UniProtKB/Swiss-Prot annotation:
Swiss-Prot/TrEMBL catalytic activity: S-adenosyl-L-methionine + a thiopurine = S-adenosyl-L-homocysteine + a thiopurine S-methylether
Signal peptide range in chain numbering: none
BP term (GO), one: methylation
Encoding gene, per UniProt annotation: tpm
InterPro entries, sorted: SAM-dependent_MTases_sf, Thiopur_S-MeTfrase_Se/Te_detox, Thiopurine_S-MeTrfase, TPMT
Protein name: Thiopurine S-methyltransferase
Enzyme class per UniProt: transferase
Primary location recorded for the protein, binned into one broad class: cytoplasm
Length: 218
C-alpha cells in the first residue's frame, strides 16, 4: 500500500478510522501495564488520535509517528497547542513539552530513536496494513524496541472475504505468528462490537471482534 493512498485519504478527510474520543480499551487497560511515570511511549501511525493527548495527560512522554503531515498539524491545531518544529534526520519533528510527533516513514525509525521507549500503543497501525506490510511492520517493531517494553495492541477480526480493508482483519493466530517469538502476547478481551458499528453492518459483516492484547518484549 503506497504512501500516496494515506496522503490522499487525509487530504480528503476520509478518516473514518479516527475516533472522536479516547479509546476505552486504552483508558481501561493502560494502567495495568505498570509503566513508571514519565516513561516514553511509542505510538506508530498515530494520525491525530486523541489517545496521544490522553497518554501525555497521564504523565507519559509520547513519541508518535505519522506519515501525513496534515494529520500532525491537525492534531496540534485541535489540541490548541503550538509546537516547536524542526528536522531530525529524515523526520520533520513537532514537539510540545514531552509530546512529540515525527512526521515521516515509520520504517525509518531506528533502534537508537526508540532506545528509551518503555511503552507501545497500537490501536490502528497493524490493521491499517495489508498482509505483506504487516509482516514488515511487526518485524520492525521487534527489531527496534528494547527488551521489557510493554504495551497494548488493538486489532479487528472479521470475515475478510466479506469486506476489503483497510481496516484489515487480523485474527489471533496472525497476531501470535507475527509477534509471539519476540513478545509475550496475552489476550485481554475480544468483544463483538458489530451492532455498535453500523457502517460495518452495511458492508455485510456478520461479526466484528475488537481484540485487545497486552504485549511485552522478551
Amino acid at each position: 500500500m503506497h504512501e500516496d493512498f494515506w496522503q490522499a485519504r487525509w487530504a480528503r478527510d476520509e478518516i473514518g478510522f479516527h475516533q472522536a474520543q479516547v479509546n476505552p480499551y486504552l483508558s481501561r487497560h493502560w494502567p495495568t501495564l505498570g509503566l513508571a511515570p514519565g516513561s516514553r511511549v511509542l505510538v506508530p501511525l498515530c494520525g491525530k488520535s486523541l489517545d496521544l493527548a490522553w497518554l501525555a495527560g497521564q504523565g507519559f512522554a509520547v513519541l508518535g509517528v505519522e506519515l501525513a503531515e496534515k494529520a500532525v498539524r491537525d492534531f496540534f491545531d485541535e489540541q490548541r497547542l503550538i509546537p516547536q518544529v524542526d528536522s531530525q534526520g529524515v523526520f520533520r519533528v513537532y514537539r510540545v513539552g514531552s509530546l512529540e510527533i515525527r512526521c515521516g516513514d515509520f520504517f525509518a525509525l531506528s533502534a537508537a530513536d526508540v532506545a528509551d521507549c518503555r511503552g507501545l500503543y497500537d490501536r490502528a497501525a497493524l490493521i491499517a496494513l495489508p498482509t505483506e506490510m504487516r509482516e514488515r511492520y511487526a518485524a520492525h517493531l521487534s527489531a527496534i524496541l528494547p527488551s521489557g517494553c510493554r504495551g497494548l495492541l488493538v486489532c479487528l477480526d472479521y470475515d475478510q472475504t466479506r469486506m476489503g480493508g483497510p481496516p484489515f482483519a487480523v485474527d489471533d493466530h496472525e497476531v501470535r505468528r507475527l509477534l509471539g517469538t519476540d513478545w509475550q502476547v496475552r489476550l485481554l478481551e475480544a468483544p463483538d462490537v458489530l451492532r455498535e458499528n453500523w457502517k460495518f453492518l452495511q458492508r455485510g459483516l456478520d461479526r466484528l471482534e475488537e481484540r485487545v492484547y497486552r504485549l511485552e518484549r522478551r
